[in-house]
UniProtKB/Swiss-Prot annotation:
Belongs to the 'GDSL' lipolytic enzyme family. Its EC number is 3.1.1.-. This is GDSL esterase/lipase At3g14220. PANTHER family: GDSL-LIKE LIPASE/ACYLHYDROLASE, INACTIVE GDSL ESTERASE_LIPASE-LIKE PROTEIN 25. The keyword Secreted applies. Residues 1-28 form the signal peptide. It is an enzyme of class 3 (hydrolase). Its main location: secreted. One of its GO terms (cellular component) is plant-type vacuole.
Length: 363
C-alpha cells in the first residue's frame, strides 16, 4: 500500500507541471536533497536510532497515506513535497535505514534534535552529530553533486521549548542568552557543511510561533493566548538568523554560499489569525490527542487520544506538528513563493544557480 501511495504522491506533481518542467541543476538532473533538523523533518530516523517506542510508527500517524512511516504527521511532510517539486519520484529516505538507497540524498533529521548538545544520548542526534554523520558519508557523492545539492535545515525549536520547560520564569536577559548560545552554534555547523562537505545551496526554514503550539498552550495553561516568552525568543532568533545568513555570504571565504530563507513563522501566524481564509476550521487545537487542546498522547495505545474526522480542516495534527495539508502549503511557498515569504530567492531559483567553488577553501 505504501508503494502505491508513493506512486500517487509522485503523480500528483505531474498535474502541477503540465506547462513547465522540473527545475534541474546545470548538469541537467534534479539536485540531490539532504535534510537536517528535528521531528518536523524526520522521515523515520527515530525508529532506526532507538529501541524506545516511537509513536510516529503507529496509527493514526500516516493516516492520510495509509503508512505510519515515522513521520510526525498524518501524511507527507515539507521535505517530501520539496523533493517532489524538484523532480524526485520517491521521498528522500532516512539515513539510518540500513536498506536505504542514498543516491538521491538522505534525511539526517530526527525527533528531539537540538542545537546545544544532546538532551538524550539514546534518543536523538543533535545538529552537530547530524552534520558529522553527513561528513562520514559525503564521499558517496561527487564534489559536483554535493555542490549542486539542496541542504534543507529546520533546527532550534527543541532548544527553546526545553528552555521554557526548565526555566518558565526566565527573565529577558536569560532568554536572550539562550538565543545567543543557539545562534553561535548554527552558523558554525552550516559553514562546516560548506567547508568539509562541499555544500553550497542551503534552504533554511525559520522557527514557527512555538508559543502558539497546542502542546505549549495546554502545558502552560495559556488559555486563548500564546506563550509570549517562547515567542519572544523565537522572534529574536529569526531576526538574528536572517542577519547571520547575510553575513555568511559576504566574506570571500564562503564564495558560492547561497541560500533561501523561508518565513515559516509568518505563514503559520497568518493561518492562526485567519483560519477561514486558508481553509481551516481549527488552528489552535490538535487533530489528534487528548487534553484541553487535544495536544497529548497521539499514537500511544495507553492514552485515549481523539482523532478529528477531517485532518485538512486542522492546522496541527498533534500537539506540535502540522497536518499534511499545512506542510504541503509550506513546501509550495518555500519552493516558488515570492520575496515576501522566502528570500533572497526561493528553492526553485536556488536549484537553477550554478554551483561555484566546488571545493571548500582551507583557512
Amino acid at each position: 500500500m505504501a508503494k502505491n501511495r508513493n506512486l500517487v504522491f509522485f503523480l500528483g506533481v505531474l498535474a502541477s507541471f503540465t506547462l513547465s518542467s522540473f527545475p534541474v541543476t546545470v548538469s541537467g538532473e534534479p539536485p540531490i536533497l539532504f535534510t537536517f533538523g528535528d521531528s518536523s523533518y524526520d522521515v523515520g530516523n527515530t525508529k532506526f536510532f532507538s529501541s524506545e517506542f516511537d509513536p510516529a510508527t503507529t496509527w493514526p500517524y500516516g493516516d492520510s497515506i495509509d503508512d505510519p512511516s515515522g513521520r510526525w504527521s498524518d501524511g507527507h511532510i515539507v521535505p517530501d513535497f520539496v523533493g517532489r517539486l524538484i523532480g524526485h519520484r520517491e521521498p528522500i529516505p532516512p539515513v539510518l535505514d540500513p536498506k536505504a538507497d542514498l543516491s538521491r540524498g538522505a534525511s539526517f533529521a530526527i525527533a528531539g534534535a537540538v542545537v546545544l548538545g544532546s538532551q538524550s544520548t539514546t534518543a536523538s542526534m543533535n545538529f552537530g552529530q547530524q552534520i558529522s554523520k553527513f561528513l562520514e558519508l559525503h564521499k558517496q557523492w561527487t564534489d559536483k553533486e554535493r555542490a549542486e545539492a539542496i541542504y534543507m535545515v529546520n533546527i532550534g525549536a527543541e532548544d527553546y521549548l526545553n528552555f521554557a520547560k526548565a526555566h518558565p520564569n526566565a527573565n529577558t536577559v536569560e532568554q536572550l542568552t539562550q538565543v545567543a548560545h543557539v545562534l553561535q552554534r548554527i552558523p558554525r555547523e552550516l559553514t562546516s557543511l560548506y567547508r568539509a562537505g562541499g555544500a553550497r545551496k542551503f534552504a533554511v526554514q525559520n522557527l514557527g510561533p512555538l508559543g502558539c503550539l497546542p502542546i505549549v498552550r495546554q502545558e502552560f495553561k495559556t488559555g486563548e493566548n500564546c506563550m509570549e516568552m517562547v515567542n519572544f525568543m523565537v522572534k529574536t532568533h529569526n531576526e538574528r538568523l536572517s542577519r547571520l545568513l547575510v553575513a555568511i555570504t559576504v566574506p570571500l571565504l564562503y564564495r558560492g554560499f547561497r541560500y533561501s530563507l523561508f518565513d515559516f513563522n509568518g505563514e503559520i501566524l497568518r493561518r492562526i489569525n485567519e483560519p477561514s481564509l486558508h481553509g481551516y476550521t481549527d488552528t489552535t487545537t490538535s487533530c489528534c490527542g487528548t487534553g484541553s487542546r487535544n495536544a497529548y498522547g497521539c499514537g500511544y495505545s495507553n492514552v485515549h487520544a481523539k482523532l478529528c474526522s477531517y485532518q485538512k480542516s486542522f492546522l496541527f495534527f498533534d500537539g506540535r506538528h502540522n497536518t499534511e495539508k499545512t506542510d504541503e502549503e509550506v513546501a509550495n511557498l518555500f519552493y516558488s513563493g515570492d520575496k515576501h515569504v522566502v528570500s533572497p530567492m526561493n528553492i526553485k531559483d536556488l536549484v537553477g544557480k550554478a554551483a561555484t567553488d566546488l571545493l571548500a577553501q582551507e583557512i
